[in-house]
Amino acid sequence: MTTIVSVRRNNKVVIAGDGQVSLGNTVMKGNARKVRRLYNNKVLAGFAGGTADAFTLFERFESKLQMHQGHLTKAAVELAKDWRSDRALRRLEAILAVADETASLIITGNGDVLQPEHDLIAIGSGGNYAQAAAIALLENTELDARTIAEKALNIAGDICVFTNHHHTIEELEIPQAMLPQGASA
């Protein structure tokens, strides 16, 4: 599978992923890009699961973003509705992590749209390792979002055989006006 991690801290949101594509117990590719920018570079998205399935979902999600003028939550809910009700989509095996300036969401194949706790998402085979590492770093350091995501992926890559150390990291800056009251850059 893979590991995707998203961290939101201060004025940044990051989604990062490794590059390993496995077929059974064989590594087929080590430098896949599982993290992308969508909707005029305003939305970050990463996937865990089947590569072909994820590309189908990326296309569908981007069309929902266009339809809803970039509104992340509306696009995610509409994609999840389609995923639940469309026979072909229901067969797709992937999970998406998406984020923009305002929200971070997980979209599952069961049709769930989840807003994570602690502004942290970790999905895929190494997700539990990355999540534990990122929580520890969020609670005990002042590291920025990118560094936390990178370190969490490195730890997951050291433990999970389906996660490697070839990372793709995308980052969005959150304008000061979009930050919660009392938060600073």
Curated annotation (Swiss-Prot):
One GO cellular component term noted in the UniProt record for this chain: cytoplasm
Entry-linked InterPro entries: ATP-dep_Prtase_HsIV_su (IPR022281), Ntn_hydrolases_N (IPR029055), Proteasome_sua/b (IPR001353), Proteasome_suB-type (IPR023333)
Subcellular localization: Cytoplasm
Keyword NADP: no
UniProt EC number: 3.4.25.2
PROSITE patterns reported for this sequence: PROTEASOME_BETA_2
Listed GO MF terms: metal ion binding; threonine-type endopeptidase activity
Regulation of its function: Allosterically activated by HslU binding.
HAMAP family found in the cross-reference section: HslV
Protein's name according to its UniProt entry: ATP-dependent protease subunit HslV
Organism of this sequence: Vibrio cholerae serotype O1 (strain ATCC 39315 / El Tor Inaba N16961)
Gene name per UniProt: hslV
